[in-house]
């Protein structure tokens, strides 16, 4: 765990409220971080780490708690969603769709985490941990990357 992540744990240990969008921390150390928040009765909010402006964490924790969720599927990365939409609706090729996403500011300067599936995999690990009430880390999450796909 890096120093930045330790600050979050220290804040929770001190009973402080924490708001984070750090999906790397939550995907790899979520059980420890959420456990510390529970132990110290500290409020840990991380809705921004998953699906941006789409509220999914609170519904998974509260509204869906009594349901039997069997799978979580979807396109949970905005850059990927944009690229796939351009490829399917406009017939744009992958390279041009990625360039346009970058030009519009949807893609990072280094879009590797987006197009290789790491970002989506981390988000799925976080959501799965909550939905299935079990520790799910990034490594076993099934995801498909976009690097050099053919035209849709």
List the predicted regions and their residue ranges.
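Conserved anion/nucleotide-ligand pocket segment
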Residues: 62-116
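Active-site-proximal cofactor/substrate-binding loop regions of enzyme domains
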Residues: 18, 41-51, 55-65, 69
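Conserved small/polar residues in nucleotide/adenosyl-binding loops
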Residues: 1-5, 144-150
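Rossmann-fold NAD(P) dinucleotide-binding segment
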Residues: 4-20
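Conserved active-site and cofactor/substrate-binding residues in soluble primary-metabolism enzymes
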Residues: 28, 51, 55, 67, ...
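Rossmann-fold NAD(P)-binding glycine/threonine-rich loop
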Residues: 23-44
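Substrate-binding/catalytic subdomain of NAD(P)-dependent oxidoreductase enzymes
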Residues: 96-146
């Amino acid at each position: 765990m890096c120093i930045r992540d330790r600050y979050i744990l220290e804040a929770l240990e001190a009973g402080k409220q924490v708001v984070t969008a750090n999906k790397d921390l939550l995907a790899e150390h979520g059980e420890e971080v959420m456990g510390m928040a529970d132990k110290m009765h500290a409020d840990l909010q991380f809705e921004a780490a998953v699906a941006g402006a789409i509220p999914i964490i609170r519904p998974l924790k509260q509204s869906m708690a009594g349901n039997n969720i069997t799978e979580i599927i979807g396109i949970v990365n905005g850059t990927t969603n944009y690229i796939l939409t351009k490829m399917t609706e406009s017939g744009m090729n992958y390279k041009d769709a990625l360039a346009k996403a970058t030009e519009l500011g949807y893609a990072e300067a280094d879009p590797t985490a987006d197009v290789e599936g790491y970002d989506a995999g981390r988000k799925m690990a976080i959501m799965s941990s909550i939905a299935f009430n079990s520790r799910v880390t990034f490594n076993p999450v099934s995801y498909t990357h976009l690097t050099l796909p053919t035209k849709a």
